Curated annotation (Swiss-Prot):
One of its GO terms (biological process) is menaquinone biosynthetic process. S-adenosyl-L-methionine binds at T70, D91, D117, A118. CDD domains: AdoMet_MTases. It is an enzyme of class 2 (transferase). NCBIfam families: MenG_MenH_UbiE, PRK00216.1-1. This is Ubiquinone/menaquinone biosynthesis C-methyltransferase UbiE. The gene is ubiE. It comes from Nitrosospira multiformis (strain ATCC 25196 / NCIMB 11849 / C 71). One of its GO terms (molecular function) is demethylmenaquinone methyltransferase activity.
Amino acid sequence: MTRTTHFGFKTVSETEKAREVAGVFDSVAERYNLMNDLMSGGMHRLWKRFAIEVSGVRTGERVLDIAGGTADLSSLFLEQVGSRGEVWLTDINNSMLTIGRDRLLDEGTAVPVAQCDAEKLPFPTNYFDCVSVAFGLRNMTHKDVALKEMLRVLRPGGCVIVLEFSRIWKPLQRLYDLYSFKVLPAMGGLVAKDRDSYRYLAESIRVHPSQEELKQMMQKAGFERVQYFNLAANAVALHRGYKF
């Protein structure tokens, strides 16, 4: 029997979701950073800096950036760990990974990169001090499996940080829906020449677990001291959990 999952509001086979998500990011990769700036008014850069602060990463530590895409977090983590540290930039999508790698090279920095599935990480157990995923978890087919893999590669005492869109403050829901389903696709069509991918973005946010649901998923995966920080009227949440 074919196993199904969500691709936005559609129910599709797991194989089809992987193919569809790959198509989305192949399409938007070249305009990804520009669209992020336009969609969030540049706020995504502040959210990512906050994620770095909350991670507590220090000089000399090892960091795994999952779904690292255009390397926003990897670039910031590099500033924290310094020359004695190690930052791995990973993504399942080659188009996104190539842009991130080339960006870091243009900045004069070379980091190890790996195209890999977050559900099957090619790293040893108990290796990293911090694992991060920003705006990538909702695209994963088996979020529970990916979270368990993140736990596996963390060393005891290490933390995971998950930055993701979440459930907005209810009084703003109608305005947010108007923005998500009318403005975003129009903006995507104008700037990235792809309305459908940004329609998927809006839909994928709506079917992603709430703040409390994701907290429970992380706890079930084995993370401890899980907490979250609501940002931008709850439209975005940063979750943090530890491995002990």
